[in-house]
């Protein structure tokens, strides 16, 4: 025996709030902090280790392939910065040292 539907369920109205933000500096604003700029230019491996450590991960993490991409994505997620993994990959692939400097400046500004 089936019963006819007497009333349709009512939809719930909700509002989605976006707490997204932007990077504090652009990828090519390398000269904003000359210390980070020089470190990123001449010893980017050391800067990558420092960024990883400042993010709360092991300083040896950048020795693993793809880990800097994971850290950049983690920074974006932690601070609700707009972007995508694809954008992160493109930045790191074509402007790796500048992107690393941006990550270091972001962590310095937010910590």
Swiss-Prot record:
Record family assignment: Belongs to the cornifelin family.
Protein name: Cornifelin homolog
Organism: Xenopus tropicalis
InterPro entries according to UniProt: PLAC_motif_containing
One Pfam assignment: PLAC8
């Amino acid at each position: 025996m089936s019963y006819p539907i007497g009333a349709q369920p009512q939809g719930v109205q909700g509002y989605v709030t976006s707490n997204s933000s932007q990077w504090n500096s652009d990828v090519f604003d390398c000269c904003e902090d000359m210390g980070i700029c020089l470190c990123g230019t001449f010893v980017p491996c050391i800067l990558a280790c420092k960024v990883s450590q400042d993010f709360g991960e092991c300083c040896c993490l950048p020795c693993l392939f793809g880990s800097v991409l994971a850290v950049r994505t983690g920074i974006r997620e932690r601070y609700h910065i707009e972007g995508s993994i694809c954008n992160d990959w493109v930045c790191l692939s074509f402007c790796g040292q500048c992107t690393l400097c941006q990550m270091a400046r972001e962590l310095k500004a937010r910590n």
